[in-house]
Amino acid sequence: EATGYGYEIHEMSEMAQAPFGQIAISNQPSFHIPYLFRHSLHPEYTNLLIHQIRSQAFHQDFQAYPGDEDNGSLSAWYIWAALGLYPTCPGKPIYDLGLPLFKEVLLHLPNHELKICSNSHTTGAYFIQKARLDGKEKQEVSHQDLLEAQVLQFELSWLPPQA
């Protein structure tokens, strides 16, 4: 016979506080859910969810994280989301493209610096029109390409790209 905990576990309380349906970004198994839309008929939903989660679930006060920090996992999710990259499939050296938070970020890699730039400072520009790695258009980026590249440029707009 299956029984419950006898009380509400913290993940359920956290999920009830967030207006994101079943995503529950406070629980690690949900971290990848917004990025799965990149592989669907509606990839534009990824960036809408990322924007909503970053702006509504994370705060700059004493309760910065939605739920407990779990040894840095929520911080790591937020950093990936702010960079505009996400390792959706563990063990596969591919990053899905998301919604960069900053106009420019400089990553200090072992042999060089990688600049990630976007026009994301423009309010409402949540949709990727084009992403270029050293001038070549990309839909996703390999780890090796990131290690060798100089510039990852996101061109964002207010409307999703036309199919």
Question: Where do the PLM segments sit?
Answer:
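Active-site core of glycosidic bond-cleaving carbohydrate-active enzymes
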Residues: E1-L101, V105-E113, S120, Q144-V151
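Short coil/turn linker and secondary-structure boundary residues
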Residues: L41, K136-V141
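Exposed beta-strand and adjacent loop surfaces of beta-rich binding modules
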Residues: E104, I128-K130
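Short strand-turn-strand beta-turns centered on an Asx-Gly dipeptide
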Residues: P110, K130-E137
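Short, isolated positions in well-ordered beta-strands
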Residues: E113-I116, K138-Q139
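Core dinuclear metal-dependent hydrolase active-site scaffold
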Residues: G124-Y126
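C-terminal beta-strand-rich structural cap/linker in extracellular carbohydrate-active enzymes
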Residues: H143-A163
